[in-house]
């Protein structure tokens, strides 16, 4: 069976969040708020883990890609809003909960299980697994279903590079992603806000698209805990809820996986 992977230019228009839909939803939510129904607003040689207390740590050897700020033609969102206004329900549902309650989140050591329809399933040390890859900066606009967006300079590697290393079986059709389940560290998981752990999925062609990345940082620095440390998925043509954070498992499947949303 020949598995064909889409090029970045082959993402179907129907799968991209349209600007019109985004703006219409934004207008609707703003109107609702006014009416009283709204709500509050190189190679990886250095560590790829946020240190205790979540200080800012530079990543070395980050290369520019063709997905630059100049190519996008938009201003970058400041570091402050990116790291202080977050959806990461594992730490709480308020926008400031992730930055407040993730400071002591331990991301080292970190293991990643890759299994399912692959040739070399296993449990991998994340830092060792990433070492052969060169980091790239990718500037993408991330849109939230809540009608806000940010332009973020992510640092990471193509997800396809990760999957290719373990070998894709010809009958793999989907890729499932699973976030860490640890209520002692992630206070939000003590409440049944969602069915834990958080799960998401992509079709195999979406996962292998060169735009889809495993991000390990932003603004040239190690990924902050509240943004999904030590690594997260970034799928720029989908809403942010499709990009799982603090991932511990990637499974290639033959059947469409169940997801949180």
Say what each PLM segment does.
Residues 53-261:
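Structured, non-membrane catalytic/scaffold regions adjacent to prosthetic-group chemistry
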Residues 1-23, 27, 34-37, 41, ...:
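N-terminal secretory signal peptides
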């Amino acid at each position: 069976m020949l598995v064909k992977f889409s090029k970045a230019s082959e993402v179907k228009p129907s799968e991209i969040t349209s600007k019109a839909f985004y703006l219409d939803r934004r207008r609707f939510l703003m109107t609702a708020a006014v009416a009283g129904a709204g709500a509050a607003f190189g190679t990886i040689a250095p560590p790829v883990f946020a240190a205790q207390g979540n200080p800012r740590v530079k990543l070395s050897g980050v290369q520019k890609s063709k997905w630059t700020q100049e190519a996008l033609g938009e201003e970058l969102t400041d570091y402050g809003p990116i790291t202080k206004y977050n959806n990461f329900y594992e730490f709480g549902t308020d926008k400031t909960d992730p930055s407040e309650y993730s400071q002591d989140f331990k991301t080292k050591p970190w293991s990643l299980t890759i299994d399912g329809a692959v040739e070399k399933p296993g449990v991998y040390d994340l830092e060792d697994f990433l070492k052969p890859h060169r980091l790239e900066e990718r500037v993408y606009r991330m849109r939230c279903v809540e009608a806000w967006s940010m332009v973020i300079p992510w640092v990471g590697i193509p997800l396809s590079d990760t999957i290719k290393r373990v070998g894709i079986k010809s009958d793999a059709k989907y890729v499932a992603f699973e976030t860490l389940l640890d209520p002692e560290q992630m206070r939000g998981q003590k409440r049944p806000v969602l069915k834990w752990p958080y799960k998401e999925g992509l079709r195999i062609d979406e996962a292998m698209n060169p735009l889809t990345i495993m991000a390990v940082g932003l603004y040239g620095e190690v990924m902050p805990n509240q943004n999904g440390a030590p690594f997260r998925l970034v799928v720029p043509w989908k809403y942010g809820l499709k990009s799982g954070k603090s991932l511990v498992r990637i499974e290639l499947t033959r059947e469409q996986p169940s997801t949180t949303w």
